[in-house]
Regions:
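C-terminal helical subdomain
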Residues: 44, 51-52, 59, 67-103
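Catalytic loop of short-chain dehydrogenase/reductase
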Residues: 4-30, 35-44, 56
Length: 103
């Protein structure tokens, strides 16, 4: 049987309750509920669905949102790749979970 993986990424850890971040935070919470719903819908199939919270990652979007932040002091994209690799293995049993890709 072929296992199919679906990942949704969402970073809501620090967005909740921040002034002027309401629409952004609401969209991230909505993604979390959507992933849980999708996971329930495909529970009896070979599809695994998980939400990955990458935490702060040095991206262009983050640099624009947080000017002056030292991009070298936060995770780099390659730092979180292992989380996605681990979730996509045949031995991974996680389904319908919110997984943090950072320490």
């Amino acid at each position: 049987m072929c296992i199919r993986d679906r990942f949704v990424t969402s970073g809501i850890t620090k967005a909740s309750g921040r002034p002027f971040w309401g629409p952004y935070a609401a969209s991230k919470i909505a993604l979390e509920v959507l992933v849980k719903t999708w996971a329930s819908e495909v529970e009896r199939t070979n599809i695994k669905v998980n939400l990955v919270d990458p935490g702060p990652v040095a991206t262009r979007m983050r640099a624009e949102a947080f000017p002056g932040e030292d991009q070298k002091k936060i995770s780099q994209p390659d730092d979180i790749a292992e989380t996605f690799v681990n979730l996509s293995t045949v031995t991974s049993k996680l389904h319908g979970q919110r997984v943090e890709a950072f320490d």
